[in-house]
Amino acid sequence: MFDIDLEQFANNTCLITTDEVFSYSDVIKASKQIEEVLPKQKQLIVFLCQMDIETIIGYIASLRANHACMMLDASLDKALLDTLIDTYKPNFIYKKSDEDDQKTIFRYKNYSLIQHNTSTIELNPKLSLLLSTSGTTGSPKMVTLSKDNLYANCQSITEYLQISSNDRVITTLPFHYSYGLSVLHTHLAKGASIVVTPESVISRAFWDSFKKYEVTTFNGVPYHYEMLRRIKFFDMDLPSLKVMTQAGGKLNHTIAKEFALWAKEHNVKFFIMYGQTEATARIAYLPYQHNIDKAKSIGIAIPKGKLSIKDIDTQKIIDEAFKEGELYYQGDNVMIGYASSLKDLQNTSSLNGTLQTGDLAYKDEDGFFYISGRLKRFIKVHGKRINLDEIEHFLKSKGYRVLCTGDDDTLMVATQDDNLQEIQKLLIDTYALHHSTIKIKHIDTFPVTPSGKIKYSELKKAFV
């Protein structure tokens, strides 16, 4: 698997469910069954991913056989899925299926490997993984990643998290999501164990498995941590827990500090991290020793990576502290490039290991980096440039449950609270905005993707 020899961990426990336990030897044996029915020439294989052992086995088999894997959400709308299939014309589709399709060439448990296209597809020899840039929208735009990208990011993450064969993680993030895949990669690479469950963190069954199998590591996006507070996580007795990580968006710094303080008190290492699919997964991390005094920071570059800030207009590197610019990243984990068509899968990298993140950032006097917003998360209200992330974070710091979006001349605030006039007055007083430029709407449930990221485009529709 991307040049990591899983055979060295043959006797280690690899995958655990409520019904089964697979050693690494079992996983290798199962994956070889799939490898043997696939052609030797590199194939494009679409995975309709679910949180189960079958998805993991199929994925490992395809990587070991040097094929290209397109990871998609199994619950993706059929019309959107059809668009992707028509665009990329994959050789095979691997999915959960109750009955054999006439084109099924192999079944592993209740999954079918279906031959979809027998034509030869010209693929970049280094292409290993395709991930969507758009969550569940079904856009054909994909991030393309090489084995070298996967290996580099895996090595960096295992180094700073100090993952070992003694670790045991539980699935919380989908496998079509770069963060979820990185958790899988890093633990397999070290011969660690993975408890595989489809249960949500708000489910009693999830925590029953967590305790029964003595899970050491928890990973989550901001949504997960907000849910943990609601289910009274701080009152739980979890003696096996040693490491917690957070990525997938900015965690409210008040919540981050609460978890940092709890973690310190319970001898748990809590890592706040930052990444993008375009960099395979991880770009920066906040060392756990600083998660209290620098709770708002994304930290420092991952091992073997480099962060810099460039002036938006001149593109010159900004060396001084607290001066805002666009964040750039350099490292071997930077993608091959984007693909929007089958022809794009032949492309070789033109990025030279450099990623323009699209995030506004600054660094402090100690060299720790802070995200201040998105270049595209700005609106102009009566000629005034408004940072939507800044306003959202400001309102959250005042205790309001809000999300912000907008367009030209209108700031839109969705809230789960009832005090709409109070929020409007605060915005008028703080940002000198006219009341006619602000729309505030009560929404019971914020729209999120399966990986817990906010669907701002859908949020905006609520104001139409």
Regions found by a protein language model. Give the residues of each.
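AMP-binding/adenylate-forming catalytic core of the ANL superfamily
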Residues: 47, 331, 337, 358-435, ...
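Conserved pre-ATP/AMP-binding loop-to-beta segment of ANL
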Residues: 115-132, 139, 162-168
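Conserved AMP-binding A3 loop
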Residues: 23-24, 127-155
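Conserved AMP-binding/adenylation subdomain of ANL enzymes
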Residues: 151-168, 178-217, 302-304
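Conserved ATP/PPi-binding loop(s) of AMP-dependent carboxylate-activating enzymes
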Residues: 300-304, 315-348, 386
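Conserved AMP-binding/adenylate-forming
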Residues: 20, 33-75, 172, 385
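Gly/Ser/Thr-rich phosphate-binding loop
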Residues: 215-220, 229-293, 306
